[in-house]
Amino acid sequence: MSSKCESVKPQLVNEVLGYWDLLKPKIMYLVVLTGITGMIIAPGNIHPFIGIISTLCIALGSGAAGAINMWYDSDIDALMQRTKNRPIPSGKIARSTAIELGLVLSVISVTVMMIAVNYLSGILLAISIGFYSLVYTMYLKRRTPQNIVIGGIAGALPPIIGWTSVTNAISIESLILFLIIFVWTPPHFWALSLLNYQEYEKAKVPMLPVTHGIFTTKIYILVYSIILFIITLLPGIFLKDCLLYETCAIPLGMTFVFHAFKVFVSINHYKYKAMFTYSIAYLFILFICIIISSF
């Protein structure tokens, strides 16, 4: 009896971890942080309970989009070294289970957001899930090298959703936060695509290095990084502690551009990986700086 229990435990743990991975938790963490940032810097007050509900809905919505993405992309995930161990290709989770979970979480997150918070936030959450799942995953990703650029709209919406959870309105401040994430997304993913362009080519995914070459991709990364640096100066206009924010944002942005420049002049894969890794830390730190500078 005890041996049976011991054999069931690892299986159960693997299944639970499979479900968790299906929700793309690394993306979820960033989505939640940017959503909370929108809530914190928005004018007015939000009841703590409503804030928690809004945060949970944003997290569930992100997880729902991740599950639908993994369901649809399971065929190409199985072909790529980087993604072959994801829950569906590895056999941890069935494809049918993934889409069912994604749809259920989508309905729950949007419905609860509409009822408990406000309709505008619920509608924006639905747009974010739908854009990532339908427009990016099912249409853009396999058809155009601009997949990441246009698809970035979905990932850039959470700070607006957080803002509208408090104000029930969209403002220029929330749009600036949207713009930061929107412009950050392409160089972040293009750095990853430089690392794995041969796998994308094998899976017939038209990422920029596959369709336009490595050199062109490097130019795009550098240009977008410079534009991002300029845009990240804008929150200083409306944050309470402008000096503190700019003291953080300027060196962070300069380092981002420096990494992009190193990618541009190098053929070393370690530079590509360093750019990708830094870009993740960069956005986390930048949005934490925005939160701190709002007090």
From Swiss-Prot:
CDD domains: PT_UbiA_Cox10 (cd13957). Its EC number is 2.5.1.141. Carbon 2 of the heme B porphyrin ring is defined according to the Fischer nomenclature. It is a multi-pass membrane protein. Converts heme B (protoheme IX) to heme O by substitution of the vinyl group on carbon 2 of heme B porphyrin ring with a hydroxyethyl farnesyl side group. HAMAP family: CyoE_CtaB (MF_00154). Belongs to the UbiA prenyltransferase family. Protoheme IX farnesyltransferase subfamily. It is an enzyme of class 2 (transferase). NCBIfam families: cyoE_ctaB, PRK04375.1-2. It catalyses: heme b + (2E,6E)-farnesyl diphosphate + H2O = Fe(II)-heme o + diphosphate. Its main location: membrane. GO terms for molecular function: protoheme IX farnesyltransferase activity. This is Protoheme IX farnesyltransferase. GO terms for biological process: heme O biosynthetic process. One of its GO terms (cellular component) is plasma membrane. Pathway: Porphyrin-containing compound metabolism; heme O biosynthesis; heme O from protoheme: step 1/1. The chain crosses the membrane at residues 27-47, 48-68, 93-115, 119-136, 147-167, 175-195, 219-239, 247-267, 275-295. Keywords: Cell inner membrane, Cell membrane, Heme biosynthesis, Membrane, Transferase, Transmembrane, Transmembrane helix. It is found in: Cell inner membrane.
